[in-house]
Amino acid sequence: MTTRVTGNERRGRQLLLRFSGFLSAALTVMALITATRALAPVVAYIAPQRVRSHFMRRAFASGNCRSRRFSVLRSTVGTETRNENNITTPYHSPLPTSRYVYQSSRTLSSRNPALPLESTLMHSNANELTDVELKNLVAHWRDHPVLNPMVTFRSWVVPIKGKMIQAILNSKSLQPYLASRHELLQEMHVRLKIVRDYTDSTDGTEKLILLHPDTPPLSELPADVQQLLRNCQIHENGPVMPTKFTYKDFTASYILSQLLPIAVHPPPTAFETIGHVAHLNLKERHWPYRFLIGQVLLETLPLIESVINKVGEVSGPYRTYDFGLLAGRNDTRVKLTESGVQLQFDLADVYWCSRLSEERQRLLRTFQPGQIIADPFCGVGALCLLAASLPQRNCTIWANDWNPKAVEYLRENARRNHVSDRIERLQCGDAYDFLMDMGLQQHQKASTRSRKEDVTNKDGNHVTPTEPMRLPDHVVMNYPVEAPKFLGALRWWPVPPSSRRGSTTRDGGIGSVIVPRVHVYTFARADPTTDRDAEEVAVDLVAANLLPLGNTIHCRTEMNEDYDCDIQVHPVRDVAPGKVVLCGDFR
């Protein structure tokens, strides 16, 4: 017999099933929340920054943060950082923004109502700060108490006798007690004067030496130190010396380490100085604080008037890059001096790298007075002007660049440094054509000389004029991205019949030529698949582009044996992990 289910019973069963599903989902969510709170410390160590920030906030809010590191962070919020003498001391914990910055921001908020009471510096993820919070932080960081501390130094009264004061300062036993050992002073770019005049001295024969705030009175010092002080005729403690410091006394790296959240540590400290411009390449985690970083650098570096940050990669036919202004005036027309040579150009128009200064000096040491230097990638002409301007070099310059503005800056800088007569050739065009044309011109000169009549020398013998073909003495190809590809243009240059090395001029009758020394720059990485280091990779790259027929081993063997052309590799700089710029020199 079949039981008939009524409509009400059917609807009741459906409601019961739905309620069971909702109850199961709620229990699952509660279990996930409990697991999230319990696993917060573990996730905080291993998760990416965005996930880590979420779990840390949940842990702080719930109180279930069991990790020792984060428990210390919670317990230190709002605590005082003063010693027994009520002397404010800097906080040097691995968590530099945990308690000191928090309590300081509360004091700062009372004076600046626009600043939120909860310190914006406590946020682990800067991307979650509002625009108002970031603007307030940039506006009020100079008033932060952590950057304007008052330190009260103790002192000793020292008699002025001979070299007594210098002996105390140099004593290894007494140096730990001097004010110069204070941790805060290690973060300053100004030197504190620890020897002061003693105004209470009756006869003016005594001075004060400032001591570390934690230095105990004379009677509490170790016996050997007391005896040493008696030998130096130090018998009494001097007055305490309250000293006020401001943010202007500290280095930019210290200021940023105190202001930036832990999540974006370490703070950016490396930048390139180009005239009045500080050029940064900020990481993604520093991007939300870019204006704060720019203001700090502008305030702490006296010669800097503009702070810019590179946006994107170096690209385009002229190897330029976009940048954004972080602080200061919007002016990228810079003036700088290198080894007495004045350079002026606009960073927005040309490529410039101050880190190549040492490499330019190395090249200059290889130049001889009166030589001809060819630079197919001259840029604004720093190397060209140095070679032409320095009295001990006085070289003749053949220069070329693809960027018309770079060529114009070189022409103006040559006129500014009074070496325009040394710039014999200056053109704007393709570097391959520039190199190839020099070789073709020498072939034409050789053909012209071969048609001339023989002349008689002083011995009465008929000879053909053998004036060397005038190729440059040095060719500098500083364009690491593609310079080796232009080596094929050298195949248009005359090759001397003799391959013996040891002289820049190789004789061979009509074909006598001056053999240039080529300096070609390239990027290189080690190749573990072929067991070659970066230098071997660079040598093979140069050989393969100079003699493209055959494999690289064949090319290298042909250059070494047939042409007696040994490539010497010099490291220039690191540009990325495992990636370097190398300079290959050969004749």
Swiss-Prot record:
<comment type="subunit">
    <text>Monomer.</text>
</comment>
<feature type="binding site">
    <location>
        <begin position="430"/>
        <end position="431"/>
    </location>
    <ligand>
        <name>S-adenosyl-L-methionine</name>
    </ligand>
</feature>
<feature type="binding site">
    <location>
        <position position="360"/>
    </location>
    <ligand>
        <name>S-adenosyl-L-methionine</name>
    </ligand>
</feature>
<dbReference type="InterPro" id="IPR029063">
    <property type="entry name" value="SAM-dependent_MTases_sf"/>
</dbReference>
<keyword id="KW-0949">S-adenosyl-L-methionine</keyword>
<dbReference type="GO" id="GO:0052906">
    <property type="term" value="F:tRNA (guanine(37)-N1)-methyltransferase activity"/>
</dbReference>
<keyword id="KW-0496">Mitochondrion</keyword>
<keyword id="KW-0963">Cytoplasm</keyword>
<comment type="function">
    <text>Specifically methylates the N1 position of guanosine-37 in various cytoplasmic and mitochondrial tRNAs. Methylation is not dependent on the nature of the nucleoside 5' of the target nucleoside. This is the first step in the biosynthesis of wybutosine (yW), a modified base adjacent to the anticodon of tRNAs and required for accurate decoding.</text>
</comment>
<dbReference type="InterPro" id="IPR056744">
    <property type="entry name" value="TRM5/TYW2-like_N"/>
</dbReference>
<keyword id="KW-0489">Methyltransferase</keyword>
<feature type="region of interest" description="Disordered">
    <location>
        <begin position="446"/>
        <end position="469"/>
    </location>
</feature>
<keyword id="KW-0539">Nucleus</keyword>
<protein>
    <recommendedName>
        <fullName>tRNA (guanine(37)-N(1))-methyltransferase 2</fullName>
        <ecNumber>2.1.1.228</ecNumber>
    </recommendedName>
</protein>
<dbReference type="GO" id="GO:0002939">
    <property type="term" value="P:tRNA N1-guanine methylation"/>
</dbReference>
<dbReference type="Pfam" id="PF25133">
    <property type="entry name" value="TYW2_N_2"/>
</dbReference>
<keyword id="KW-0819">tRNA processing</keyword>
<feature type="compositionally biased region" description="Basic and acidic residues">
    <location>
        <begin position="450"/>
        <end position="461"/>
    </location>
</feature>
<comment type="similarity">
    <text>Belongs to the class I-like SAM-binding methyltransferase superfamily. TRM5/TYW2 family.</text>
</comment>
<dbReference type="GO" id="GO:0005634">
    <property type="term" value="C:nucleus"/>
</dbReference>
<keyword id="KW-0808">Transferase</keyword>
<dbReference type="InterPro" id="IPR056743">
    <property type="entry name" value="TRM5-TYW2-like_MTfase"/>
</dbReference>
<feature type="binding site">
    <location>
        <position position="478"/>
    </location>
    <ligand>
        <name>S-adenosyl-L-methionine</name>
    </ligand>
</feature>
<dbReference type="GO" id="GO:0005759">
    <property type="term" value="C:mitochondrial matrix"/>
</dbReference>
<dbReference type="InterPro" id="IPR030382">
    <property type="entry name" value="MeTrfase_TRM5/TYW2"/>
</dbReference>
<dbReference type="Pfam" id="PF02475">
    <property type="entry name" value="TRM5-TYW2_MTfase"/>
</dbReference>
<dbReference type="InterPro" id="IPR025792">
    <property type="entry name" value="tRNA_Gua_MeTrfase_euk"/>
</dbReference>
